[in-house]
């Protein structure tokens, strides 16, 4: 279990998919910080949580191509987004998948998918990330502060409010 802090404009009694949001040009999820003072700068309500995270999105290695295809195929904005790649849907899938895979790391690839295929649908993004067995991504900021973007609300246990 990992200790983290949530901050927001309102008090939260439990975490659900309604808490999933977009965060500063990132993947969609529930945002936590590893450091309490940093969390206090983000909002008036701060709570300590424990995160039980099993499978994390890699910030170093590439994603599985089948997972990328799943995320594109099940995206709510799929038809609209695919039109940006080609008029022929089959060709558009190939081009879109190649475009996403050029992101390099799994984290960057899923960030591209979130922005291009799940715009205005953060909850669906999180649910599909859980379907391909990811709980969260952890982003180090070099100053020993880690941001956790959690897809699965079941991984969050509130310690105190």
Annotate each predicted stretch with a short phrase.
Residues 1-31, 36, 43-161:
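Active-site and NAD+-binding cores of ADP-ribose-processing enzymes
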